[in-house]
Amino acid sequence: MKIGVLGVQGDVREHVEALHKLGVETLIVKLPEHLDMVDGLILPGGESTTMIRILKEMNMDEKLVEKINDGLPVFATCAGVILLAKRINNYKQEKLGVLDVTVERNAYGRQVESFETFIEIPAIGKDPFRAIFIRAPRIVETGRSVEILAYHEGDPVLVKEGKILASTFHPELTDDLRLHRYFLEMVK
């Protein structure tokens, strides 16, 4: 199994390190043809407007949508969720539009208002998961086929739709590998 990490901007290194700790071969995806070389893909946190602009400049956006629609498993964190969302409230931004959610960018505040909390994620076990929110998006609406795996103060923060796993927080910034392991099970 080989997992790609989109390498255009953001928390690339942190995801690669998490995957290496799990003994997984990785590829930093920087070219459209790299998408044909991976069994699953992680879209890291970062700055979503920069990421979509770079994807378009590299002509990778259409290929990525095609691969996801063909069943490529994807794990998106923070800005990656914004990239995948079908709808973004109160902000005009291009997106890939493959995940049936509506999001609000930076909904939990600015960088200085970032926070950590523990959340319950029954799908990965009974122990709470340390969730780090940094200028995180808020999922304000989910489509019928979207399964909500975790909440924070009533808002969905971890969702799954088909082969897409989407987290508004940053699991790659913790030592807890359970979400990465959960994603690898989706890829198998």
UniProtKB/Swiss-Prot annotation:
Gene Ontology BP terms: glutamine catabolic process; pyridoxal phosphate biosynthetic process; pyridoxine metabolic process
GO CC list: cytosol; glutaminase complex
Molecular-function GO term, any one: glutaminase activity
Entry's EC annotation: 4.3.3.6, 3.5.1.2
Catalytic activity: aldehydo-D-ribose 5-phosphate + D-glyceraldehyde 3-phosphate + L-glutamine = pyridoxal 5'-phosphate + L-glutamate + phosphate + 3 H2O + H(+); L-glutamine + H2O = L-glutamate + NH4(+)
Active-site residues, as the UniProt record annotates them: 78, 170, 172
A UniProt-annotated Pfam family: SNO
Gene3D superfamilies assigned to the protein according to its UniProt record, in alphabetical order: 3.40.50.880
Binding site for L-glutamine: 46-48, 105, 134-135
Oligomeric and partner information: In the presence of PdxS, forms a dodecamer of heterodimers. Only shows activity in the heterodimer.
Function: Catalyzes the hydrolysis of glutamine to glutamate and ammonia as part of the biosynthesis of pyridoxal 5'-phosphate. The resulting ammonia molecule is channeled to the active site of PdxS.
Official protein name in the record: Pyridoxal 5'-phosphate synthase subunit PdxT
Annotated source species: Thermotoga neapolitana (strain ATCC 49049 / DSM 4359 / NBRC 107923 / NS-E)
Gene name of this polypeptide: pdxT
